Amino acid sequence: MRVILNFRPQNAVKRWERCMNLDWADNQSYSEILLIGFLVCLWWSFMTSLSYAQITPQGRDQTYKQAAPDRFEERFKKQEFPKSQLVPVKPDNLKPVFPAEMRKVNFLLQRMVIKGSTIYGKRQFSRLFREYLHKRINLEQVYIIAQEITNMYRNDGYILSKAVVPPQKIEEGVVQIDVIEGFIDRVAIQGQVRGPRQLLNEYRKALLKSRPLKALDLERYLLLVDDLPGVSVKSVLTPSKFKQGATNLTLILDNKSYDGSFGVDNRGTKFNGPIQINAGMSGNALFKNYERIGLQGVVTSNTDELRFFSGFYEQPVSSEGTKLFFSGSFSDSEPGSTLKDFEVAGESKTFTIRLTHPFIRSRSENLNGFVSYTNRDTETLILGELDSEDRLRIVNLGVSYDFVDKYKGINLVSFNLSKGFDIFDSTETGSEQLTRSSGHSDFTKVSGEALRLQQLAPSWMLLGALSWQYSFEKLLASEEFGVGGAQYGRAYDSSEITGDQGLAFKLELQKAFQPNKKYFKDLQLYTFFDYGKVWNRLPTSTGSTGENLSSLGLGIRFNVTDVISGYMEWDKPLNQEVSSEGNKDGRVFFSLSARF
């Protein structure tokens, strides 16, 4: 009853207000909790997506092997081929035939006099007739000795020299043989001269100075003329009507003002390609200095993925074949496929100056040396941030030697020494953001190639080739040895595996056919096996220090006309999956090009 009597309206209102204040406070706290939870979820989602977008070490390695532009120059480098060629030589089955009456002229040989030789001495000649001295011989044997002297000159390369038996009266057993040492007396030039005549005059003087004329001198200077940009030369030798032993040489020049090419292939990758379109153009002696100026461009069907442009200038600087060569290239790339999400973008600029000299130049043997300096700057961005920057300054010394041997094999051996220097604003060893964190910009490495093309039968050939590299330090990405692509590891993408050291070889059996049809000139069937292995001085992102791959395949090369050519081949990876494909399925590659 007291509880009821104590009820007052004012107390009820106060209790209601306290309840309302409590609910409002609880709602405010609840809203704050929801807001904090929302922000936490948003942050977690952002961090999750960010961590998802971070490129893995394996993905970064693949980028620098196959998609970054610092490997494009190696990818599009043309293979070096031997200049030597098999020269058909007809066996000399025709022995000189002398009249039978010569055998009837007999006499006692007391002394033999050989006149006119400036090359050989008495001792070298005496071995040819020593056995006949103080014996009775006939006139035919004297002519045989003269022929042996001629053969001695010819075998030593004096192609215009010969020995003759002059008319004489043999008295007291003394016989005379005259040697006529042949030489070039006049050099005439037919056709348009598109460069400095002084250069051709230097070649002319060198040929006139070769007395007696050696085949090596004649070959060397004719080939050096033929090596001039856009020039092809034919030569005609005619005996002089006025001088004994003299020969006149006529050079017939044919000139081509420009060379061009256009081609398409599928040798790209999923990241840059796979369809590649290339075009090139070069002008010959445009400034009348026997210089060559050229441009080349390569793009993919999606031009953002790969753009590669290069140019060069080549200039003869001596009459002995020395040439100065300037070249530059620019490439950039925004790889697609699985690398697109990582916004990879790269750029590379290269400048090279090279001096080359042919120490030996002939149809069957060539020795070339060169010295060069290369300036290469590359940078790669990932997710819009600078991931790597290399600036390399490299000096190269190299030599290549090719020759034909007696077993009808054409051989090529090359050796190259490369040395990096920390000069001219290069990125020094130990700098941040290098393509390989422990890579050396002041590296030293040696590399080389060997090739042999062996004729097995008139239409069968066996090709064997080897490429290698050894480095004394850990290298940056552009200087690594790569396996994969059109030369070695043909079933794999370009630079499928790379390393500081490497070795690769291939064997290819070839069979040639010549249909000689109007629109199908010739073709070649071939089958091959190749293998390559690389080693790294430090473990890679996968923890390994070495990788290897092998493949085999078969294909056909063809010349539709003198202008259009191409190939198609089926290649099978053997021991390792193609990284961009994720399998070891067979692959088909093709190329079609036109040269004009």
Task: Label each region the model flagged.
Residues Q54-G268, G280, V298-R307, L466:
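Periplasmic polypeptide-binding modules associated with outer-membrane biogenesis and secretion
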Residues V233, Y258-G260, F287-I293, S319-F325, ...:
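Repeated loop/turn-to-beta-strand initiation elements of outer-membrane beta-barrel proteins
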Residues G245, G273-I277, E305-F309, E347-F351, ...:
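Residues that define the transmembrane beta-barrel architecture of outer-membrane proteins
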Residues Y258-G268, A279, Y290-S301, F309-G311, ...:
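Transmembrane beta-strand segments that form the barrel wall of outer-membrane beta-barrel proteins
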Residues F262, M281, I293-G297, L324-G328, ...:
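Membrane-embedded beta-strand positions of outer-membrane beta-barrel proteins
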Residues M281, F558, K584-F596:
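Outer-membrane beta-barrel "beta-signal"
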Residues D304-D405:
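Transmembrane beta-barrel wall of Gram-negative outer-membrane proteins
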Residues E379-L523, F528-Y531, W535-R537, E581:
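C-terminal outer-membrane beta-barrel translocator/porin domains of Gram-negative envelope proteins
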